[in-house]
Amino acid sequence: MTGTARSALPLPQSPARALRPSGAARAAPSLSPSRFSACPLDPSSFPTSGNKMFIGGLSWDTSKKDLTEYLSRFGEVVDCTIKTDPVTGRSRGFGFVLFKDAASVDKVLELKEHKLDGKLIDPKRAKALKGKEPPKKVFVGGLSPDTSEEQIKEYFGAFGEIENIELPMDTKTNERRGFCFITYTDEEPVKKLLESRYHQIGSGKCEIKVAQPKEVYRQQQQQQKGGRGAAAGGRGGARGRGRGQGQNWNQGFNNYYDQGYGNYNSAYGDESYSGYGGYDYTGYNYGSYGYGQGYTDYSGQQSTYGKASRGGGNHQNNYQPY
């Protein structure tokens, strides 16, 4: 049996008929607010439309609420996020803000200096990577191998028309692995899915991330190494001069800004497309796609899913690279 089992689904005239029993189309599953996502959509995950900003130079102590309150004086803030280190949970010193109107961005830029929590911050108009296509493919982690393909079709089909489902197989055991890939015919179902980072599918809780091409994954790794290197200097400075003085922590955000933000996240989410894009995509490669922290060993890296049982058999401890 090949390493990856692909199940290509025909493109139906009506996704409700192709993926669900006959009758009225089911509504998308209701999504309870997740404690892991402070805002419904991560503004860093969508291409810029003129009303999105990158905010660099943030203090470690600045929260989403602080940033939102400050920028609300320039116009209505629809959404905001501050990127955090996936290991420590500490702010990485930059974030993104989405205004309702593009005119608000102009107002922010008209002011030469912006100071928040005792620090000069660096707001810029967000850049989008050229030629970026809207995300249509998602990675589903933490999926029980016992979940049937029909269950997967039923759940994800409720969000929109599915083009393809990929169910990777373990090349040694010929058994299903604990994750899959879903490709939709357009990007709208992906946006709906990412309104919640975690979804109850079958018998377990699964994490949803946007599938990133390997070249994007590698670019993210290079960017994140720069950010983490600066972070180390920042933490050292903080110990020597007191909290909030580690200026080097923020040096890494310039690299992120210069590279553009259309493909960051992660992750949406990553860390992302929260799902948040701010999660490191390290340790796992699947074909031409790169995936991140937690997929080499879900039980060890993602405590949300629980520890693997000592007796073995827990599907969450078998995410090893090909």
UniProtKB/Swiss-Prot annotation:
List every position bearing Phosphoserine.
Answer: 144
The Dimethylated arginine modification is found at: 310
Post-translational modification remark: Dimethylation of Arg-310 is probably of the asymmetric type.
Its annotated compartments are:
Nucleus; Cytoplasm
Q: Cellular component per GO? A: chromatin; cytoplasm; nucleoplasm; nucleus; synapse
In this chain, where does the modification N6-acetyllysine occur?
119
What Pfam families is this protein classified in? RRM_1
Task: List compositional bias (Low complexity) regions by residue number.
Answer: 14-36
Which UniProt key words apply to this protein?
Answer: Acetylation, Activator, Cytoplasm, DNA-binding, Isopeptide bond, Methylation, Nucleus, Phosphoprotein, Repeat, Repressor, RNA-binding, Transcription, Transcription regulation, Ubl conjugation
Q: Where is this region: Disordered?
A: 1-36, 216-251, 299-322
Could you tell me which residues carry Omega-N-methylarginine? Answer: 6, 310
Where is this chain compositionally biased, Gly residues type? 226-245
Q: Which residues carry this modification: N6-methyllysine?
A: 64
Domain (RRM) spans: 51-133, 136-215
Top-rank taxon of the source lineage equals Eukaryota
Q: What GO MF annotations does this protein's record show?
A: DNA binding; RNA binding
The protein's name in its UniProt record:
Heterogeneous nuclear ribonucleoprotein D-like
Organism name: Rattus norvegicus
